[in-house]
Amino acid sequence: MRLSLRNRGFELSLGWKDQVSDFKYGALLNITTLSNKVLSLGYEKPFIDSGQARTRLNGPLAEFFLYKTDGIFKTQEQIDNYVTPDGEPIMISGKRPQLGDVKYIDTDNNGQITADDRQFCGSPWAKMQMSLVLNAEWKDFDFSMMWNGQFGNKIYNVSKWQGRLFSDNSNYLRFKKGEEPYQVNQNSDTPRIIYGDQRNSWDADRFLENGSYFRLKNISIGYNLKKEWLKNLGIDKLRLYATGSNLLTFTGYSGLDPDFINTNIWNSGTDSFSYPNTRSVMFGLDLTF
């Protein structure tokens, strides 16, 4: 039996057109919601793991499955209190944590941070998608703009995670001011660097971010030259225009672009150095003879 998936949602479309004297204008709003549920994974599998995601029966496709964290250890008192309900010290990779280490949640309270402590942390699927198109005309001028966005989804910033491994001599991402590792800035929330040791760079919710965004996808303004100016040139119509794409994005995501494509459906919410959408401005003319 193959994968069986059920998608549910609704779509709402609202449009408006009007004219006041020489001014024409219109608007079109589309809102879409979608939720999916895995009904069968085939071959009686209870789940499928892929990278930072796990797909399970009766859950969404490619749900994030990660270690949950509670900041980093900044005082010795926090380390001393890092114990099970029975008072047993909690070990990370068989060792007690030190100042600047990540504080992982011991989900099963067995005193050992292992893969069994991972938890479901959110869905890569947006709860709502929206697009808004506005257009207007006044005499020989025309204007249009399109916004789109999605809201309520999570993104795992693999690019940031890979840039924090410090397990070899590879190149790594530069730290922003105020986000330096613990050895440099003890007031930041970035854990200490341990060369050759990845305990502070496990697949954790530290790299899980809000993927919501609202973007000005396209904006255009044009002007049609008057026909009497063109008749001696043998031109029926000449329109000058300027257009821009992806000029403005509102988002809290720290990666290059929250609007990316991951072709691996089992890990669709992970951004691994995805190429961003191009920001562009163009000028042109349309000629009709």
Q: Model segments located where?
A:
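Transmembrane beta-barrel architecture of outer-membrane proteins
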Residues: 7-11, 24, 127-131, 213-220, ...
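Extracytoplasmic gating/loop element in the C-terminal half of outer-membrane beta-barrel translocons
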Residues: 150-245
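Transmembrane beta-strands of outer-membrane beta-barrel pores
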Residues: 16-18, 31-37, 138-140, 149-153, ...
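Outer-membrane beta-barrel and related beta-rich outer-membrane complex signature
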Residues: 26, 36-52, 152-180, 250-259
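Repeated loop/turn-to-beta-strand initiation elements of outer-membrane beta-barrel proteins
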Residues: 10, 22-23, 140-143, 228-229
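Membrane-embedded beta-strand positions of outer-membrane beta-barrel proteins
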Residues: 12-14, 27-29, 145, 240-242, ...
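Conserved small-residue
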Residues: 3-6, 10, 19-123, 245
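C-terminal beta-signal and terminal closure region of outer-membrane beta-barrel proteins
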Residues: 1-7, 49-76, 176-177, 188, ...
